[in-house]
Each structure stands twice: as C-alpha cells, then as structure tokens.
UniProtKB/Swiss-Prot annotation:
Disulfide bonds: 31-64, 107-303
Processing after translation: During soybean germination, seed storage proteins are hydrolyzed by protease/26S proteasome.
Applied value in biotechnology: Emulsification efficiency of glycinin is improved by degree-dependent glycation with soy soluble polysaccharide (SSPS) at 60 degrees Celsius in both the acidic (A) and basic (B) polypeptides as a result of subunit dissociation at the quaternary level. Thermal treatment of soybean seed proteins leads to the aggregation of glycinin acidic and basic polypeptides (GAP and GBP, respectively). GBP improve sensory properties of meat (e.g. pork) during chilled storage and inhibit bacterial growth (e.g. L.monocytogenes, B.subtilis, E.coli and S.enteritidis).
Record localization: Endoplasmic reticulum; Protein storage vacuole
Name of the protein this chain belongs to: Glycinin G3
Length: 481
C-alpha cells in the first residue's frame, strides 16, 4: 500500500512539473536576426547500414530556436543502434516503414517469446513493446528514453529528428548529445562542439592510456571491464563484445542485420485491421469519467503511453481547401505524449500557386522542413524587414522565430512540409482572410490605422473569404464571383 501511495505521489508531482514546465531563454541578441537562409545539412556520417546528416546547431537561427536537427537514412535490414539524448526529441518519418522500440525505465517487459517444443530449459525472451511506423508518423521520444529503429522493407527509411536543447529537461549545456549503448560510431554533433584545453596535470602517457581504454565510443565502452563483469554476471569475452573491442569502424551507428531481424512484434495487418486501437483520440481532460478510467496507475500513464501519431496525407486534416491544400497538426490535446516533450508538429500540403496567408506563431518557434516540391517563402521581423525572400526546396530547413510573420506560395504541383513547433499547444494568428487579425478589427479602426477610405477598409476586411489557405488567383475569382 505504501508503494502504491508513493507511486501516486510521484505521478502527481510529475504532472505538476510538466504542467508548469518552461523553455530556457536564448542568449541576448541570438534572435536579433537580420537575415534567414534555407539550410541544407552540412555534415554526413556514413555507417554500414545507412547514414546520418546534421545541420550545424551553432547557426544563429538554431541558437535562437534552441533546437538541433538531423536526418537519418536506413537501408534495407538496417538497424539504428539504441541511444538516448539529453533533451526531448520528435521524429518525423519522411519515407518508408519499419519497426521501433523505446525503453521505458521501470516498466515491465510485456512481449514474450512463445515456448518452443524441446526447449523447456531455455529462458524465454521478454522485452518491452515494439511498434510499427510508416510514412507520415510523428514519434515522440522523451528525454533520456533509449530507442532503436529498424527498416524491414525495401524502401529506404528517411527519418527527420528534432532535439529541443532549450528544454528545461536538458540539464547540460545547449549542445545536443547522443548516448549510444553500443558501437564505435562518431557523435553526429561532435564536430560542432568547441575544442577546449583540458585542465589538470594528467601525464601524456596517462591520457593516451585512457583514450585507448575509451576508444569504443559507446556508454559501455567507457567502463572498466571488471565493472561490467560484475554488473552483467558474464565473462570477459562477452564484456569485450559489449564494449565493441575489435569492431570494424565502418559499422557505425547503423548496422546491417544479415538475414533480417527476428523479434516479437504485432503483425502490420493486425494494426491495419484495428486502426482505431492505435490511432484513437485520447480522452478529453475535462471528462472526469475518462480520467478515472485512463489515469489510475503508473502502468496506464507511462508504460502504455501512445508514442506515434500520423499527420501525413490523412483523410481528416484540421484545415482543408480542395483548391488550395490541407494542414494537419499534432498537439498534446490529440497526442498526449507531446505534453512530456513540450513540442508539437504540423504537416502541410499546398497545391500549385496556392498560398498560406501571412501569419505568425504566437507562442512557439517554427522549424519548417520541406518534404516535397518547392515554395516561395517570405519572412518579416519586428522591424518590418524582409529577412527571408526566396525558395524553400525539398530537403531544406527554414527556421521562423516566434512572432516573425511568414507567408508561403507553392511553386510546384504539390509542396509538402513538416513544421516542428517548440510548444505542445501552439497558436497561430493569421494576418489576412477570415478570422484574421485585420478581419477582427472594426472598419473604422482599419480606416484610421492605414489611412484608407471606408470602402477600401471594407475590402481589406472582407474580400478574402478563406482563413489560412488561399487558392490560386484564378480560383479566387471564380469563388468571389
């Protein structure tokens, strides 16, 4: 009984902490941006089963937003080794499908290998839940939670990851760090870290000896072998394997599994037959009956948390205009795991020459990654200066700081993007169209503010009947007529 009370107290305390969480503020002048650029990755690390690309987190827009970005490509039968980070992260699946696992510390292993005949003495494998992922999925990874990912299909998997280094959960500095459990891979953000002189009076011989002992590159490789023998109760030969001794450097963070990975996981067909079980919306927080059903213990709040939510080409977008495009947003209201991360995401699709009207994010920075096609984008800062005026193309990233105004017009048949937001409940204010800032002002205020005649003020206020997505001009004329 005492343990149960302690667990409940822990949950209540954790809930309060998350409810009043905050982001660290960027350093002074980091958001005094006079010019933005559409950025491509500037570093690539090859591995046996794929590669990882990164954007420089020291660039001023990344420093202002307090985030780091990477893109991982997994080939057929490629396994990304388990790792965890010092800050929460969101992963968007741009392409492909496969399986992934995430380790919830302290939660039970609920997947069990079936007992085979004649193998009664062999211990059965038990592990935590394995999930399927597909194109368009958003995966939530809490701070310090180890996860792995595997591509079991022919199509390469492309996963874009955002790490929120400004999160209050990051107790280190603003440099992103990935802690691998195995392997001898290079840290993807290591080259961006400033090199500092080591203090102390350690001899050169001692330094070389320590470097040789730690050459494996993973968490386990740094421990003394006798420590691991004691901890795992295994012999020295197994410990050498755990520490990656004599492993080929080319393997890296992504390894190829010969013959494919054989693990216990629910079949994809089963998930497709019961999509409502995987994608069902979570209860309304105001529904007391719902709270009593879904929040009655640690297993049901943490260990069974839903970790993926599809926001790709969906049949039920949040905003839809058949002539302009669609927008789908994932927030903590429909994807509660995001309340742990204090992050959210938006998927958008724009038809050719359609426009996302000028708007701004009230309470979040926006990290826009172009998935497909190209669009003409303009961004304006608080001084009325156009800090970006150019094309955003597939594979490029554009960071729009909080309250900076932005507008986009598709230049291709179908421009698609995903926008990561640094708030789990972001708000957008549109400057034009229905329900916009100007639409909500009295005509007289518009007239006096912009020195317009009354009829002109009425046109500014009412001529655009659309809210966020505006069709091409030809379609607009037909609608107005």
């Amino acid at each position: 009984m005492a343990k149960l009370v302690l667990s409940l107290c822990f949950l209540l305390f954790s809930g309060c902490c998350f409810a009043f969480s905050f982001r660290e503020q960027p350093q002074q002048n980091e958001c005094q941006i006079q010019r933005l650029n559409a950025l491509k990755p500037d570093n690539r690390i090859e591995s046996e089963g794929g590669f990882i690309e990164t954007w420089n987190p020291n660039n001023k827009p990344f420093q202002c937003a307090g985030v780091a970005l990477s893109r991982c490509t997994l080939n057929r039968n490629a396994l990304r080794r388990p790792s965890y980070t010092n800050a929460p992260q969101e992963i968007y699946i741009q392409q492909g499908s496969g399986i992934f696992g995430m380790i919830f510390p302290g939660c039970p292993s609920t997947f069990e290998e079936p007992q085979q005949k004649g193998q009664s003495s062999r211990p059965q494998d038990r592990h935590q839940k394995i999930y399927h992922f597909r194109e368009g999925d958003l995966i939530a990874v809490p701070t310090g939670f180890a996860y792995w990912m595997y591509n079991n299909e022919d199509t390469p998997v492309v996963a874009v990851s955002l790490i929120d280094t400004n999160s209050f959960q990051n107790q280190l500095d603003q440099m992103p760090r990935r802690f691998y459990l195995a392997g001898n891979q290079e840290q993807e953000f290591l080259q961006y870290q400033p090199q500092k002189q080591q203090g102390g009076t350690q001899s050169q011989k001692g330094k070389r000896q320590q470097e040789e002992e730690n050459e494996g590159g993973s968490i386990l490789s740094g421990f003394a072998p006798e420590f691991l023998e004691h901890a795992f109760v295994v012999d020295r030969q197994i410990v050498r394997k755990l520490q990656g001794e004599n492993e080929e450097e080319e393997k890296g963070a992504i390894v190829t599994v010969k013959g494919g990975l054989s693990v216990i996981s629910p079949p994809t067909e089963e998930q497709q037959q019961r999509p409502e079980e995987e994608e069902k919306p979570d209860c309304d927080e105001k529904d007391k009956h719902c709270q009593s059903q879904s929040r009655n213990g640690i297993d049901e709040t943490i260990c069974t948390m839903r970790l993926r939510h599809n926001i790709g080409q969906t049949s039920s977008p949040d905003i839809f205009n058949p002539q302009a495009g669609s927008i789908t947003t994932a927030t903590s209201l429909d994807f509660p795991a995001l309340s742990w991360l204090k992050l959210s995401a938006q998927f958008g699709s724009l038809r050719k020459n359609a426009m996302f009207v000028p708007h701004y994010n009230l309470n979040a920075n926006s990290i826009i990654y172009a998935l497909n096609g190209r669009a003409l984008v303009q961004v304006v800062n608080c001084n009325g200066e156009r800090v970006f005026d150019g094309e955003l193309q597939e594979g490029q990233v554009l960071i729009v700081p909080q309250n900076f105004a932005v507008a986009a017009r598709s230049q291709s048949d179908n421009f698609e993007y995903v926008s990561f937001k640094t708030n789990d409940r972001p708000s957008i204010g549109n400057l034009a169209g229905a329900n916009s800032l100007l639409n909500a002002l009295p005509e007289e205020v518009i007239q006096q503010t912009f020195n317009l005649r009354r009829q002109q003020a009425r046109q500014v206020k009412n001529n655009n009947p659309f809210s966020f997505l505006v069709p091409p001009k030809e379609s607009q004329r037909r609608v107005v007529a």
